[in-house]
Amino acid sequence: MPIIKVRENEPFDVALRRFKRSCEKAGILAEIRRREFYEKPTTERKRAKASAVKRLAKKLTRENARRIRMY
């Protein structure tokens, strides 16, 4: 759980923004969304594998584009 200390004379908006940023860095909202509903282990593995394939395709596309620009 991200904890921030509110500084003296610090506006509430600024403290809230710092808290939101620290929550985003910790990945709390993503974790809450992921755990909102039960996901069967097979479905979880399937989703993880699909995202890995997507990441690899994206990486290869970027590398391919970089090679094309070099010539």
UniProtKB/Swiss-Prot annotation:
Alphabetically, which GO biological process terms does the record hold?
Answer: translation
Write out the entry's keywords from A to Z: Ribonucleoprotein, Ribosomal protein
Note whether Ribosomal protein occurs among the keywords.
yes
Gene Ontology cellular-component terms for this entry are: ribonucleoprotein complex; ribosome
**Quick check: keyword DNA-binding in the entry?**
no
Instruction: Give the superkingdom in one word.
Output: Bacteria
- Any matching Pfam family: Ribosomal_S21
Q: What is a GO molecular function of this protein?
A: structural constituent of ribosome
Sequence similarity: Belongs to the bacterial ribosomal protein bS21 family.
Please identify the protein, giving its name as recorded. Answer: Small ribosomal subunit protein bS21
Q: Point out the gene that encodes the protein.
A: rpsU
